[in-house]
Amino acid sequence: MRSPQALLQGDPEIAGLINKELERQQSHLELIASENFASPAVMAAQGSVLTNKYAEGLPNRRYYGGCEHVDAIEELAIERAKQLFGAAWANVQPHSGAQANFAVFLALLKPGDTILGMDLSHGGHLTHGSPVNVSGKWFKAVHYGVDPETQQLNLESIRQLALEHKPKLIVCGYSAYPRSIDFAGFRAIADEVGAYLLADMAHIAGLVAAGVHPSPVPHCHVVTTTTHKTLRGPRGGLILCNDADFAKQFDKAVFPGTQGGPLEHVVAAKAVAFGEALQPSFKQYSQQVVANAQALAERLQERGIAVVSGGTDNHVVLLDLRGIGMTGKVADLLVSEVNITANKNTVPFDPESPFVTSGLRLGTAALTTRGFDEAAFSEVADVIADRLLNPEDAAIEQRCRDRVASLCQRHPLYGPASPVLAA
């Protein structure tokens, strides 16, 4: 079955728009930290006939017939996830990281319970108690931040907050924190106050799987993640734990607690991605992701642009633009004009609103998939610096655009395996 050709013939309008998106991805430098490029194999699994199958329930315990093959696929996804992260149990059904987090909340908490998570403006996530999210509406949310001097986590200050507020759940794991996380230290705090510990490793899951970032699995009561970002799979969620009693609660919280039928085509794509991440080449890839982020941070600082915490231990580089008198909103627009995709982001103790911000968040996972190395990322840093430091210079703007085009041509996306739809 030639799906690209079928789409081209069946709906040329959608096919044309997909082609335009492919061209955009090929011709732009993707630096959004939460994005990556899934392999053709992952995309093939997600676009398969599994789209047609309903399969409410768990493998071998379904509410529908005809599930023998999706059972085998989901069991394989579960086993690969357990092997990849060294966990005793996994649920591969959550549709997203947010769904995974909410399933954990449903299993462990009651409305009004206290949760302790990182402040969104310091690098946390909406689902960790933000007042605009259900996690902040249904539960009493207390937030910790980073140290004002080091811009890194201070476990003693977090411990004092925990002792004061006695949370039922502590959340660690973030969306814009560039440093390594001491999961054992967090577990000690959780045990001291009698709290559950949830690690949301959505951003660093691939690095954890490859062993280039400490794993939360041995230390936390439960771990959630997305399956894209650094893990390079389809967009989806995953829950892991080592406790059989918790596992039963989490299974019920996913179905029927928060979801109906799982997306078995996405589950298959997750299984493919987990299989890819179990290969030795994925460890090399993940090591390169971190090396590239450190090269990017180092060169940007050499060019006079501040980096939050002075560097990075993972794939995230968070720029603090206050020193050059620029907002994140303006910087986001400036780099987009030379075909670099990033996102404005708050920085710790940011005086600007979340709609303006003082920061620009960069990530290295996607371009590392395209084969970028440290030298290429140093060049990327120069392009960014040239653009941000010379916003009114049309000649420099064009030169930046030309350098982006050259970098993209030297590091093609997908190449012969391109999922292009055009005839």
UniProtKB/Swiss-Prot annotation:
Cofactor(s) for this UniProt protein: pyridoxal 5'-phosphate
Cellular localization per UniProt: Cytoplasm
Keyword Cell membrane belongs to the record: no
EC number from the UniProt entry: 2.1.2.1
EC class of the enzyme, as a word: transferase
Pfam assignment, any one: SHMT
Catalytic reactions on record: (6R)-5,10-methylene-5,6,7,8-tetrahydrofolate + glycine + H2O = (6S)-5,6,7,8-tetrahydrofolate + L-serine
Chain residues that bind (6S)-5,6,7,8-tetrahydrofolate: 120, 124-126, 353-355
Modified-residue entries (N6-(pyridoxal phosphate)lysine), positions: 229
An example Gene Ontology CC term for this record: cytosol
Pathway: One-carbon metabolism; tetrahydrofolate interconversion; Amino-acid biosynthesis; glycine biosynthesis; glycine from L-serine: step 1/1
Annotated CDD domains: SHMT (cd00378)
Role, per record: Catalyzes the reversible interconversion of serine and glycine with tetrahydrofolate (THF) serving as the one-carbon carrier. This reaction serves as the major source of one-carbon groups required for the biosynthesis of purines, thymidylate, methionine, and other important biomolecules. Also exhibits THF-independent aldolase activity toward beta-hydroxyamino acids, producing glycine and aldehydes, via a retro-aldol mechanism.
Subunit comment: Homodimer.
Assigned protein family: Belongs to the SHMT family.
Name of the featured protein: Serine hydroxymethyltransferase
Species the sequence originates in: Synechococcus sp. (strain RCC307)
